[in-house]
């Protein structure tokens, strides 16, 4: 019984860390990366459509993204959506493709991005701790129902805490790497 709870705990904590990693991918670190545009949605035929479903996104140079729309009539809408996403970039179009020059980050902007990364890290840690709380509640219910003994409850709770510590340290490690990447000039 308690093994099922531990398995679910591990899966949910893994998902929380994976979600955090995806969130970090959208934080710009001076180099062009197609994931920068992952959250951009375009008003296309009356529906909000992710940009990566309407176009291909390439990186021809270290500080340049090229968006090639599958439907050339959507270029204006795509440009507006990129501007509206407030990514700190300005798209330029030649009628068939959209070029996005990634400006070098200023020291001030780097520090702002580090704060954003730390905020995301804290949210991810809270998510992991919420999983811990839910798992401990589930274990207590099992013990109350007589499915596990008090000793098994204590041992399982310690295992849940070890998992929590492991995933929080993973978050810290990923955060440290991202901060280093951002502060790199």
From Swiss-Prot:
One of its GO terms (cellular component) is cytoplasm. This is Ribosome-recycling factor. Keywords: Cytoplasm, Protein biosynthesis. Responsible for the release of ribosomes from messenger RNA at the termination of protein biosynthesis. May increase the efficiency of translation by recycling ribosomes from one round of translation to another. NCBIfam families: frr. The keyword Metal-binding does not apply. Belongs to the RRF family. The gene is frr. CDD domains: RRF.
């Amino acid at each position: 019984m308690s093994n099922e709870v531990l398995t679910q705990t591990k899966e949910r904590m893994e998902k929380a860390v994976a979600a955090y990693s995806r969130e970090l991918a959208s934080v710009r670190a001076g180099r062009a990366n197609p994931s920068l545009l992952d959250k951009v949605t375009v008003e296309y035929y009356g529906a909000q459509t992710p940009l990566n479903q309407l176009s291909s996104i390439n990186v021809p140079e270290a500080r340049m993204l090229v968006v090639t729309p599958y439907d050339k009539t959507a270029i204006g809408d795509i440009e507006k959506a990129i501007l509206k996403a407030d990514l700190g970039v300005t798209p330029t179009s030649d009628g068939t493709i959209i070029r996005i020059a990634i400006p070098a980050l200023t020291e001030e902007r780097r520090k702002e991005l580090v704060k954003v990364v730390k905020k995301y890290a804290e949210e991810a840690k809270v998510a992991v701790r919420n999983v811990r709380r839910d798992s401990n509640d589930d274990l207590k219910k099992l013990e109350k129902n007589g499915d596990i003994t008090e000793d098994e409850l204590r041992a399982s709770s310690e295992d849940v805490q070890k998992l929590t510590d492991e995933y929080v340290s993973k978050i810290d490690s990923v955060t440290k790497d991202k901060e280093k990447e951002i502060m790199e000039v």
